[in-house]
Swiss-Prot record:
Known cofactor(s): Mg(2+)
Protein name, UniProt field: Polyribonucleotide nucleotidyltransferase
All residue ranges annotated as the KH domain in the record: 551-610
NCBIfam families named among the record's database cross-references: polynuc_phos (TIGR03591), PRK11824.1 (NF008805)
Pfam families per record: KH_1, PNPase, RNase_PH, RNase_PH_C, S1
Binding residues annotated for Mg(2+), in chain numbering: 484, 490
Origin organism lineage: Bacteria, Pseudomonadati, Thermodesulfobacteriota, Desulfobacteria, Desulfobacterales
E.C. designation(s): 2.7.7.8
Record's subcellular location: Cytoplasm
Reaction(s) catalysed by this chain's protein: RNA(n+1) + phosphate = RNA(n) + a ribonucleoside 5'-diphosphate
Gene from which this protein is expressed: pnp
Enzyme class label: transferase
Gene Ontology cellular-component annotations: cytosol
Length: 695
């Protein structure tokens, strides 16, 4: 029997339905807002996996093209292949806030699948899927410390809006997805048109308040349809064995974790672990994995204690201190812009490539086909962390990090009308020890400036961390990879000197107090301004000239009625122009022609041909043209591509001409003046009139 639970959000009905569809799943919910509908299911395996050191959670988000009343445009006419970027990002958006809410030590596989089955093209299904994931877990038999909810926050004309439509978001200066529980925020992700920390905090707190009815809705759902949760007892810790590990390793770990240098620290800890295993291995030969797990837990505990009770960081920095920074620009000769940004043991090579319209990315989405003229790709090869493993395509993490850096920089790029290039940035992570995504933002900014892209303002980014217990809370600036591992928060903030352009916050604790959020943002502002100062010391403003290897783009405006002539029958004319001039030509219905060439000479040659075709001859106009044919009565002169006029023999010179070829020959280029254009389009030309005019 289906039951429906409803509330109102931003003047529209928001509903959860359960009990009718996908009843064999542990939890199944249909979320509807407007005419956008998402089915979300949650299932957990009955048996636990052996020796699992992480939560075996998988989140999938699928957008069915039929949801928009369309047939997929690929050859097979069905959804195939790897998930789209939007699907990958939304799966991460769901995964990150729910992951900390499962029982510690849970080892049975959990799978959450969100499927978009209807879309009205107004209400984005991603936040509906997030709410649905929590709701499905709430009503399932899977232990889950929810509920949480999520929604999008926009701001139009200074007014905050909860779950604005896709159309409303076009006029919003903030786009923020906030996830939270009844009492606190658990995840934040979004971008903004350079807004202050105070405005961003206000947006986050507005979102948290606005989502409360969605949390209540889930509580009502659980009360009515919730299944009894599985009995689960976290794995018991052998206190006697743990005591032996502590006795053997605690003091040595305390020294080892404070070893300077990432690999030196890793080696020092490996040496201690090896010693512990060798000492206990004979007596506990069948429990080596358990000893390794205990050792890892002890490393975290000792590292946290150093921060919380000894007021120190493991690398000796102050809590608000940024690692040493070096910046270089112009490090690669042929790409159109490049920069090497190094912060501590994190290093990113930023590479800029400029292209033209055909280089834009074309994407099939639920809302139709879209194009993107700015792309940012993030690569994290195994050598960047000293590992030897398969180097495949981009992972979910790579896509997510690239998207965050894209958000940070997209807000400062010039309008396409002012800068007609397609822009591709690549962040190649050369070394990583914390916050390579923010390193990509910094390297990307410098590469753009090195390439002469007129950005509105340079952007820098920083990652903040948190270590907290019942008594103490410490916010860390510019966290190491180890601090991310043993800490409670990863909070990335990017922006200009004036404000924030992007941020992303994930936590490992159940919720984040408001006071900590305020402190983290304020401390992040100080840190990223420090980084920005170091960047500007290398390159203060974008270069006034682009790379000589960047394509040249020339625009020509013609009469729209002439577009057919530019293209020619079956595209013959435009293909001929492109082949002859080694250019790429785009034709807009408005008559705007964009020509992309490898050099100025080719571009100008193509522009001249296009202008010639696109212009209408004018009476009295003077043109330079080629004699294409001579007859007894005159010469035909091509004054533009596809347009010939006749110079009668009497108009060839200001003296009597007996024979046309005595004055002009085929292939000769001459200057002529238009005397007349008849009703049927015939053009009378004259050389004599031009000679008389120039006397």
């Amino acid at each position: 029997m289906e039951q429906v639970f409803k509330t109102e959000l931003n003047g529209k009905e928001f509903s959860l339905r359960a009990g009718k569809i996908a009843k064999q799943a542990s939890g199944s919910v249909i979320v509807q807002y407007g005419e956008t509908i998402v089915l979300v299911t949650a299932v957990a395996a009955k048996e636990a996996r052996d020796s699992v050191s992480f939560l075996p959670l998988t989140v999938e988000y699928q957008e069915k093209i039929y949801a928009a009343g369309r047939i997929p445009g690929n050859y097979f006419r069905r959804e195939i292949g790897r998930p789209s970027e939007k699907e990958t990002l939304t799966a991460r958006l769901i995964d990150r806030p729910i992951r900390p809410l499962f029982e510690k030590g849970w080892a049975s596989e959990i799978q959450v699948i969100a499927t978009v089955i209807s879309t009205d093209k107004e209400n984005d299904p991603d936040v509906l899927a997030l709410v649905g994931a929590s709701a499905a877990l709430q009503m399932s038999d899977i232990p889950f410390a929810g509920p949480i909810a999520g929604l999008r926050v926009g701001r139009i004309d200074g007014k905050f809006i909860a779950n604005p439509t896709v159309q409303e978001m076009e006029n919003s200066d903030i786009e923020l997805v906030v996830a939270g529980s009844k009492t606190g925020v658990v995840m934040v992700e979004g971008g903004a048109d350079v807004v202050s920390e105070a405005d961003m905090l206000e947006a986050i707190f507005f979102g948290h308040q606005a989502m409360q009815p969605l949390i209540q809705l889930q509580e009502d759902l659980k009360k009515a349809l919730g299944k009894e949760k599985r009995a689960y007892t976290p794995p018991l810790v052998d206190e006697e064995l743990m005591a032996k590990v502590v006795e053997l390793a605690q003091d040595k770990i305390h020294t080892a974790v404070q070893t300077q240098g990432k690999f030196e620290r890793v080696k020092a800890l490996d040496d201690v672990r090896t010693e512990v295993i060798e000492t206990l291995g004979e007596a506990f030969a069948d429990r080596i994995n358990e000893i390794k797990s205990m050792f890892g837990d002890l490393v975290k505990k000792v590292s946290r204690k150093i921060v919380l009770t000894e007021n120190q960081r493991i690398d000796g920095r102050a809590f608000d201190e940024v690692r040493e920074i070096t910046c270089e620009v112009g490090v690669l000769p042929r790409p159109h812009g490049s920069a090497l940004f190094t912060r501590g043991e994190t290093q990113v090579l930023g590479v800029l490539t400029l292209g033209s319209g055909p280089d834009e990315q074309r994407i099939e989405t639920l809302n139709g086909n879209e194009t993107r003229n700015f792309m940012l790709h993030y690569n994290f090869p195994p050598f960047s962390v000293g590992e030897c493993r398969r180097a495949g395509g981009p992972s979910r993490r790579d896509v997510g990090h690239g998207n965050l850096a894209h958000r940070a920089l997209a807000r400062v790029l010039p309008d396409q009308a002012d800068f007609e290039y397609t822009i591709r940035l690549v962040g190649e992570v050369m070394e990583s020890n914390g916050s390579s995504s923010m390193g990509t933002v910094c390297a990307g900014t410098l590469a753009l400036m090195d390439g002469g892209v007129p950005i509105a303002a340079p952007v820098s980014g920083i990652a903040m961390g948190l270590v907290s217990d019942a008594d103490n809370t410490v916010v860390l600036t510019d966290i190491l990879g180890d601090e991310d591992h043993f800490g409670d928060m990863d909070f990335k903030v990017a922006g200009t000197e004036q404000g924030i352009t992007a941020l992303q916050m994930d936590i490992k604790i159940r919720e984040l107090p408001k006071a900590v959020l305020v402190k983290a943002l304020d401390q992040a502002r100080i840190g990223r301004l420090h980084i920005l100062k170091r960047m500007l010391a290398t390159l203060e403003i974008h270069r006034d000239k682009m790379s000589p290897y960047a394509p040249k783009i020339i625009t020509v405006k013609i009469n729209p009625d002439k577009i057919r002539e530019i293209i020619g029958p079956g595209g013959k004319m435009i293909r001929s122009i492109q082949a002859d001039t080694n250019t790429n030509i785009e034709v807009d219905d408005s008559g705007l022609i964009k020509i992309a060439a490898e050099n100025q000479e080719d571009g100008e040659a193509a522009a001249k041909i296009v202008s010639d075709i696109g212009m209408d001859p004018e009476i009295g106009g003077i043109y330079e043209g080629e004699v294409v044919k001579t007859t007894d009565f005159g010469a035909f002169v091509r004054i533009k591509t596809g347009t010939d006029g006749l110079v009668h023999i009497s108009e060839l010179a200001n003296h009597r001409v007996k024979k046309v070829t005595d004055v002009v020959k085929e292939g000769e280029v001459i200057r002529v003046k238009v005397l007349e254009i008849t009703r049927d389009g015939k053009i009378r030309l004259s050389c004599k009139a031009l000679e008389e005019e120039e006397k």
